[in-house]
Amino acid sequence: MARVCEVTGKGPMVGNKVSHANNRTKRRFLPNLQYRRFWVETENRWIRLRISNAGLRLIDKNGIDVVLADLRARGQA
C-alpha cells in the first residue's frame, strides 16, 4: 500500500540527512498518515480513510460530505 494521503495526495519526499560533520545522505520524509473512521450521515455508514494531519484539518474545515464528493469527482472513492 502506498504511503499517500487519500484526501490531499501527500506522499513521501526525498531530502538529506545532515550529520554534525555536515555529511549528507539521502533519506525519506514520510507523511503523518493515520487511519480514521468518519460517520457519513447522508449514507448512514462509516468511512475509513488513511489521511494525513492536513487532510484531517481539511475535513474539520469543510466537512466529510464535501471531501467525499471531491474524492468521488476525482474517481478515488
Swiss-Prot record:
One of its GO terms (cellular component) is cytosolic large ribosomal subunit. It comes from the Bacteria. The keyword Magnesium does not apply. It holds the Pfam family Ribosomal_L28. Keywords: Ribonucleoprotein, Ribosomal protein. InterPro entries: Ribosomal_bL28 (IPR026569), Ribosomal_bL28/bL31-like_sf (IPR034704), Ribosomal_bL28_bact-type (IPR001383), Ribosomal_bL28_sf (IPR037147). GO terms for molecular function: structural constituent of ribosome. One of its GO terms (biological process) is translation. Belongs to the bacterial ribosomal protein bL28 family. HAMAP family: Ribosomal_bL28. This is Large ribosomal subunit protein bL28.
